[in-house]
UniProtKB/Swiss-Prot annotation:
Binding site for Mn(2+) 1: 8, 99, 102-103
Protein name listed in UniProt: HTH-type transcriptional regulator MntR
Cellular component GO terms held in the UniProt record: cytoplasm
GO terms, biological process: intracellular manganese ion homeostasis
Cellular location(s): Cytoplasm
Assembly and interaction partners: Homodimer.
Length: 147
């Protein structure tokens, strides 16, 4: 199983390859706000652990194992963003919140969150009811804060 740091790299590499057809060390370093030498070290580790095939000066590609993990990590990230949106988290907080929690949830928890997201998506009235509850809760918090 990859470490949280390895997951971050695999997710970025997967997204870059999906969007551009390739992933360069410089783009990965920029996306993760790390030094290119750190990316090179991690790429070598991911190669050793068979998540990607790396040839010095020639680049790298994800292995089938790396692609499978990458797909699952992107799914997890998107699912958590959707979940936080449904439960009314402010848009400006969603990305950072997902980054803060995604590595700390088991896949069982992710699957249950997926079930919950599907439950809400299956019937728009459920989302409306939840938004009503959130609005009432926010009003109570504001009233309490004003006292």
């Amino acid at each position: 199983m990859p470490t949280p740091s390895m997951e971050d790299y695999i997710e970025i590499i997967y997204n870059l390859i999906e969007s551009k057809g390739y992933a360069r060390v410089s783009a990965i370093a920029e996306a993760l706000d790390v030094h290119p030498s750190s990316v090179t070290k991690m790429v070598q580790k991911l190669d050793k652990d068979q998540y990607l095939d790396y040839e010095k000066y020639r680049g790298f590609v994800l292995t089938s194992k790396g692609k499978k993990i990458g797909e699952r990590l992107v799914f997890r990230h998107e699912l958590l963003e959707e979940f936080l949106e449904i439960i009314g988290v402010n848009d400006e907080n969603i990305y950072d919140d997902v980054e803060g929690i995604e590595h700390h949830l088991s896949w069982n928890s992710i699957d249950r969150i997926g079930d919950l997201v599907n439950y809400f998506k299956d019937d728009d009235s459920r989302v409306k009811d939840l938004k009503k509850v959130i609005k009432e809760s926010d009003q109570q918090v504001n009233e309490t804060a004003e006292k």
